[in-house]
Amino acid sequence: MKVLIQRVSHASVVVEGQTIGAIDKGLLLFVGIEKTDSTETLERMANKVLAYRVFSDDEGKMNLNVQQIGGGVLSISQFTLAADTQKGLRPSFSCAAPPAEAQALYDKFVNLLKAKHSPIATGEFAADMKVSLLNDGPVTFMLTM
């Protein structure tokens, strides 16, 4: 599982001209589900995302997590994160979970986030999405499990 997290001032996602998810200050997640991912992987990643300290405290040190600042989370499924880019000039998606399995795992991941934090907004699995964001920093991390 790979999750690219970005600290944002605000972010939104549009599908077919309609805004379907938006947050103010918080985290934008791009989530790639791989063949080897399990429920345990999802639980560990959800906990890590919510506890990851990327927001500044009063001394300017990245010492606060999204829950501590009352921020939002916008989660976007992105199978291209599971690409193998080691060889050639075209990515291979052999490590990505098959679509039906990936959707079930992604939905479970979102539900784990929702059980622990609010607000959680999402895009639409496998849709052509337009994601807008205002990076804060920029602060971006790739989390892998």
UniProtKB/Swiss-Prot annotation:
One term of GO molecular function: D-tyrosyl-tRNA(Tyr) deacylase activity
Subcellular location(s) per record: Cytoplasm
Entry keywords, A to Z: Cytoplasm, Hydrolase, RNA-binding, tRNA-binding
Recorded catalytic activity of this chain's protein: glycyl-tRNA(Ala) + H2O = tRNA(Ala) + glycine + H(+); a D-aminoacyl-tRNA + H2O = a tRNA + a D-alpha-amino acid + H(+)
SUPFAM superfamilies: DTD-like
GO-annotated cellular components: cytoplasm
Protein EC: 3.1.1.96
Matches recorded under InterPro entries: Daa-tRNA_deacyls_DTD, DTD-like_sf
Primary localization: cytoplasm
Keyword flag Flavoprotein: no
GO biological process: D-amino acid catabolic process
EC top class, as a word: hydrolase
Motif (Gly-cisPro motif, important for rejection of L-amino acids): 137-138
PANTHER family to which the protein is assigned, alphabetical: D-AMINOACYL-TRNA DEACYLASE 1 (PTHR10472:SF5), D-TYROSYL-TRNA TYR DEACYLASE (PTHR10472)
Domain notes: A Gly-cisPro motif from one monomer fits into the active site of the other monomer to allow specific chiral rejection of L-amino acids.
Family stated for the protein in its record: Belongs to the DTD family.
Described purpose of this protein according to its UniProt entry: An aminoacyl-tRNA editing enzyme that deacylates mischarged D-aminoacyl-tRNAs. Also deacylates mischarged glycyl-tRNA(Ala), protecting cells against glycine mischarging by AlaRS. Acts via tRNA-based rather than protein-based catalysis; rejects L-amino acids rather than detecting D-amino acids in the active site. By recycling D-aminoacyl-tRNA to D-amino acids and free tRNA molecules, this enzyme counteracts the toxicity associated with the formation of D-aminoacyl-tRNA entities in vivo and helps enforce protein L-homochirality.
Record text on subunit structure and interactions: Homodimer.
Name of the protein in question: D-aminoacyl-tRNA deacylase
UniProt source species: Saccharophagus degradans (strain 2-40 / ATCC 43961 / DSM 17024)
Gene name per UniProt: dtd
